[in-house]
Regions:
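An alpha-helical appendage that flanks or caps ligand/catalytic pockets
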Residues: 48, 56-98, 132-241
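Long hydrophobic segments that form regular secondary structure
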Residues: 111-125, 131-135, 143
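Acidic/polar active-site rim loop that often engages polyanionic ligands
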Residues: 42-52
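Short, acidic/polar
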Residues: 16-20, 108-117, 227-237
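Hydrophobic faces of well-ordered beta-strands that scaffold small-molecule active sites
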Residues: 2-5, 32-36, 104-108, 123-128, ...
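Structural motif
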Residues: 27, 120-121, 241
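Glycine-rich anion/phosphate-binding loops
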Residues: 9-26
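Non-cysteine beta-strand/loop elements that form the S-adenosyl-L-methionine
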Residues: 33-39, 208-212
Length: 247
């Protein structure tokens, strides 16, 4: 895949998304994927005048949204759709995606409802490893893949990470500290925390500081910090617990 586009399903009509995605799949020569976000930031819903639904209902909406998209990608003739959230007639979309049967779907659901959505609907789940370590990650990934197998599917687990590679571990650690502590844009991160509702009133100071550090270091990704050998070893550990890819 050459890259993913992200769509917020409550704010994008599935007919438009299906046509846009199929077009991009042709432009990219069949190297396109669609990252689906079921929505969580209420301000965005208000900006678009979209209905604010409960957490689990947003995933239910996402299932129907994706069902309609996939039908548009597969039906050769016009069809009608009568669902809980969408009702449409004379639906039709050409060209169909190059990839068969469909472009891959990614989702970053981490809650029980989100994990179920990813396991039953997506080809890839974007995993946030707890505590930035592999210890608790295996259970997360095993649970996701078991849910997928129980639905007759296979799903990959992906993470995002950041790399600080130097000749020695100390040089890597020192450089990480330098660009985070001395060069980091803490004003921007604090603005982000406020937008996310993660202020000192809701999180302990230590948790806030950890979030700030890893966000500046690499958008909160998994730290791959050290010598080339150390980083290769760490990637190997991630593969052992079931990680299929790193962005």
């Amino acid at each position: 895949s050459c890259g993913f586009s992200t769509t917020h399903v409550p704010l994008t009509h599935p007919v438009a998304a299906a046509k846009q995605a199929a077009t991009i799949d042709h432009i990219s020569g069949g190297r396109f994927g669609l990252n689906i976000v079921c929505g969580w930031f209420k301000n965005e819903f208000e900006m678009f005048g979209a209905e604010w639904r409960t957490h689990d209902e947003r995933y239910e909406y996402g299932v129907e949204w994706l069902d309609l998209v996939r039908q548009l990608w597969s039906h050769s003739k016009e069809f009608d759709f009568d669902g809980k959230y969408f009702n449409a007639k004379n639906l039709w979309s050409e060209p169909k995606p190059l990839q068969s049967p469909f472009p891959p779907i990614m989702n970053a659901g981490g809650s029980p409802a989100g994990q179920h959505f990813a396991a039953t609907q997506a080809e890839m789940n974007f995993v946030i490893l707890r505590d930035h370590g592999v210890e608790g990650g295996k259970a997360q990934i095993d649970n996701l893949k078991e849910m997928a197998r129980n639905s007759g599917r296979e799903v990959q687990s992906w993470i995002h990470g950041y790399v600080v590679c130097r000749d020695t571990q100390k040089e890597a650690d020192d450089y990480l500290e330098h660009y985070v502590r001395a060069k980091g844009d803490y004003v921007a991160v604090d603005n982000l925390l406020e937008i996310f509702g993660m202020q000192s009133e809701t999180l302990a100071p230590e948790a806030l500081d950890t979030f700030r550090f890893h966000f500046i270091a690499g958008h909160g990704g998994y730290p791959l910090v050290g010598t080339p050998e150390r980083i290769v070893d760490e990637i190997g550990k991630l593969m052992e617990i079931g990680i299929d890819g790193i962005l």
